[in-house]
């Protein structure tokens, strides 16, 4: 990986994602050795597959596995079981100029009482973030406060319509009957509460991406909130998954809508998290896969998305949420070419807590605005999140190998220093 020299008025920092001293300066030797053990375990695909089957079963049957999970994979990828525990991690990150994106990691509790409780918890997170300058964003999943089946039905109706996404969405809402109409009003009220509180507290809301078969109403609801709250500053961000072959065009159409409606488009760019599930469903149901044909196509669209956003930086607030070293370096190069300040309010970088510290901490050291995505919640509630992390790291052999090589390199450096 080449070293990129960055010219700026205040200093002349150099970014190298090979610098493990900077990457792991927040970690003790004990913490690094534990991380080495976890990533080494994830290198064994059969072990991960076994864990994916056994862990949910063990939790469901109340077997005493919480302690083991808490000390291993949970500690590596999750901030804590409560908001209060997570604030300790956020404060530790602050010492290294790394910010935190808080994510209340609860998924799939399908009843109105739990939807209201989840909404209340999102509000509590926003209120905390509003008092902490080191927590500029919080993340929400719309499925945390909306029935999956309701979103699925809306999605199917939207797809049948004609015209822009918003026209099709509003027509789908008009066609709702009786209880579903009331359900939509409750959904909109929850989303408005969250975004209004965030706007008042100066906290950004990152709306997580969902499966393709419920994504249309999520996109439309997010666009509706951006049209309401993003007039003067960017409060609401949509998450755009570039492992889908249609998302670069969607990004451009979203920007056009922002221009026409005079709001700032919030765009958190990711590669994606549901690839295997998407391919499997497409094959089972006999429709064309929404997934890119290969990794090169995904990388091409992701980097093109970064360039598009930076070329329209007055209208787009960009979050580069990536573990790909080239994409992060590419974004920094584009910023420099366009003479953007390192802490430009419309450019932010982010990586998951527990991964790619070499990117996060070296970007922070160089002066860029960067954060760790920091989920929290009871172990039983964040199991879906942890299962995805294990699955992704196992399937991304290169990523796991990269994490291991960097950790080993730093342990060796410390041993010899």
Where are the predicted features?
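Positively charged, amphipathic and often flexible ligand-engagement surfaces
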Residues: 2-417
């Amino acid at each position: 990986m080449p070293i990129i020299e960055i010219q700026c008025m205040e200093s002349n920092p150099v970014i190298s994602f090979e610098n493990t001293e900077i990457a792991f300066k927040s970690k003790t030797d004990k913490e690094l050795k534990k991380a080495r053990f976890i990533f080494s375990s994830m290198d064994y695909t059969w072990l991960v597959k076994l864990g994916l089957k056994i862990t949910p079963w063990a939790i469901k049957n109340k077997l005493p596995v919480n302690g083991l999970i808490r000390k291993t994979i949970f500690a590596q990828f999750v901030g804590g079981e409560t908001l209060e525990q997570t604030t300790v991690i956020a404060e530790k990150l602050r010492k290294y100029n790394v910010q935190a994106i808080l994510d209340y990691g609860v998924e799939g509790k399908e009843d109105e009482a739990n939807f209201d409780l989840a909404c209340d918890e999102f509000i509590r997170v926003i209120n905390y973030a509003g008092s902490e300058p080191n927590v500029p964003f919080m993340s929400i999943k719309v499925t945390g406060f909306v029935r999956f089946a309701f979103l699925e039905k809306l999605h199917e109706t939207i797809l049948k319509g004609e015209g822009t996404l918003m026209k099709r969405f509003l027509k789908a809402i008009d066609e709702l009957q009786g209880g579903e109409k009331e359900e939509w009003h409750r959904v909109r009220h929850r989303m408005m509460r969250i975004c209004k509180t965030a706007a008042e507290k100066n906290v950004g809301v990152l709306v997580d991406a969902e499966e393709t078969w419920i994504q249309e109403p999520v996109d439309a609801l997010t666009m509706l909130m951006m049209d309401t709250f993003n007039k003067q500053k960017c409060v609401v961000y949509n998450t755009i998954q570039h492992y889908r072959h249609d998302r670069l065009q969607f990004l451009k159409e979203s920007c056009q809508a922002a221009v026409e409606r005079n709001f700032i488009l919030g765009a958190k760019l990711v590669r994606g998290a549901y690839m295997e599930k998407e391919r499997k469903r497409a094959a089972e149901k006999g429709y064309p896969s929404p997934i890119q044909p290969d990794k090169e196509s995904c990388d091409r669209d992701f980097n093109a998305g970064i360039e598009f956003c930076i070329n329209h930086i007055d209208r787009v607030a960009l979050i580069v949420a990536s573990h790909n070293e080239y994409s992060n370096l590419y974004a920094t190069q584009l910023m420099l070419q366009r003479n953007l300040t390192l802490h430009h309010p419309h450019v932010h970088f982010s990586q998951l807590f527990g991964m790619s510290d070499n990117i996060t901490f070296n970007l922070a050291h160089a002066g860029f605005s960067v954060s760790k995505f920091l989920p929290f919640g009871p172990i039983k509630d964040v199991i879906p999140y942890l299962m995805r992390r294990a699955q992704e790291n196992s399937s991304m052999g290169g990523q796991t190998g990269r994490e291991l090589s960097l950790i080993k390199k730093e342990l060796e450096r410390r041993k010899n220093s």
